Amino acid sequence: MEALLNSIPDYAKDLKLNLSAVLKQAELTEQQTWGTAVASAIASRGSEVTRAILAEAQLHLTPEALNAAKAASAIMGMNNIYYRFHHLSGNEAYSSIPARLRMQVIRTHGADPVDFELWCTAVSALNGCGTCVASHEKVLREKGMKEEAIIASVRIASVVHAVAAVLESEAAQRSL
């Protein structure tokens, strides 16, 4: 992680400091923190950020939790687009049409169900699906998770996403 932090340019110093801070939030367990970071890095599509976070996450997560975090990002990558269309179209008829999309991993991921739900919430926020955010956030609160913990995961998603964008733009500039 140190190499990743050092690769963040000076103009994004706030992001560098924020990344260090959001990975140490007291509101989240180690598994919640690193699962959120993994799911968010993958959803952000930044190869440098994803490599660094996956490498560090292996020190903090069981193989099952790591795979579940990856699965949360994968399934939300599909669901967030599908359900965002429902919301954005404004056409209620779409809600009555079966999705016909396989989503078994939501039940078979093998991680703590609340943690998986948290990772899905963070990725849904990152992907901008209001319907999915509302649905997952509601489940988390019903299962007893405090708003402070939920927003802590969204902090991770927002910072990881921003760092990924910065580093991808820096890589593009270097290739000029």
Residue ranges, per PLM feature:
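Hydrophobic alpha-helical segments
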Residues: 1-176
